[in-house]
Amino acid sequence: MNWYELYWQRITPLHLFLWPVSQLLILFQSVRRFLYRRAILTSIHLPVPIIIIDSITTDSPVKTSLIIQIANILKAAGLRPGIISRGYPDNHRPPTRVTISSHPHLTGEKSLLLTYHLRETCPVWIGYDRIETAKALLNAHKECNVLICDDGLQDLRLQRDFEAVIVDTSVINSGNGLIMPAGPLRDSFARLKHTDAVILAGHQRRIPDITDEIRTIHTRPQKEHFFNLSWPELTADAAGLAGKRIHAIVCDPDTQNFLDNLEFLKLTVTPRVFPENHHFIATDFQSDEAEIILIPEEDAVKCLSLHDDRIWVLQQEYRVDPGLREIILKKLREKFMDPKLLDILVCPLCKGSLIYKKDRLELICKADRLAYPIRDGIPVMLEDEARKLPDEEEIK
């Protein structure tokens, strides 16, 4: 356990000194919410639906996996999602797209991890101002028709159409139960009454101050597996790696959690620990003794430029209640009932405008002569699902 995890779990004289600051922060956030609800402060409405995914604690290992799942849910439904994020807390840069070749020190590891898993199918942009970042993404990717905001729980300037808050109920993340800076909570549990869904991670099945009116979604870890960094399609379980000479490379503060996971998987490893935010180079992995080198997923994005077939990544995925898909799509159906939203959609191929045919529930691309169906209230913007218009069919 590192020093800040210990800090989150205890109550010391320093915590008592910081407790009034936490109370002032809660009061400030409550006043801001009141002012936005009364329209005294103005929030910004973007042209496409906004989905906020955030954690009530300072960090959650579930969030990245959850965002990837939601992006895949939206794509499977025929939508074209994009993702916006701050990237890292001290990011004061203008909106920037994250690509697979981006440097993790400039983009943040989690944003690069999202890009690594979603590749070119879902653009990821980071920036200090979430609204400006969203506008930049939509301007560069006109085919995007829904945005996922990785964080933004407390950014009330940004109007949201769906908001889900992750609550990690494990002891290490719930800690001393105090609000920052005295504890790991970013807001009080009472804040959860104003969200669309609460996603519980951990073994605890309920949390205080949650009314029955709030939809609670449960998530649980799936079986861990490894994938080869150079060849991601190659996967293995712990049994497939057992008996080999294994080195485990990890950066603080992830050391103990990573090594505990490997011990739980009954793998015998030789650990090598590097400082937090270490920039990996090829010589860090030079070892004639190691047949296999294991790294956590958070560090994998720092090693993409290294071409070493011995590097395998421990991936922990989380299975989410299928009900999450239904409540997200229900919210989006309500949004897409507005013809004004359908009017701004563009063809994903030519990026040209579409003609909404209400009688046929189709969106027509005149240039490519394609008709995209509106199925169960959701515009299915997939070429494979589009109807090719015959030459004799007139487009009006």
From Swiss-Prot:
GO terms for biological process: lipid A biosynthetic process; lipopolysaccharide core region biosynthetic process. GO terms for molecular function: ATP binding; tetraacyldisaccharide 4'-kinase activity. Keywords: ATP-binding, Kinase, Lipid A biosynthesis, Lipid biosynthesis, Lipid metabolism, Nucleotide-binding, Transferase. It catalyses: a lipid A disaccharide + ATP = a lipid IVA + ADP + H(+). Pathway: Glycolipid biosynthesis; lipid IV(A) biosynthesis; lipid IV(A) from (3R)-3-hydroxytetradecanoyl-[acyl-carrier-protein] and UDP-N-acetyl-alpha-D-glucosamine: step 6/6. The keyword Kinase applies. Transfers the gamma-phosphate of ATP to the 4'-position of a tetraacyldisaccharide 1-phosphate intermediate (termed DS-1-P) to form tetraacyldisaccharide 1,4'-bis-phosphate (lipid IVA). This is Tetraacyldisaccharide 4'-kinase. It comes from Nitrosomonas europaea (strain ATCC 19718 / CIP 103999 / KCTC 2705 / NBRC 14298).
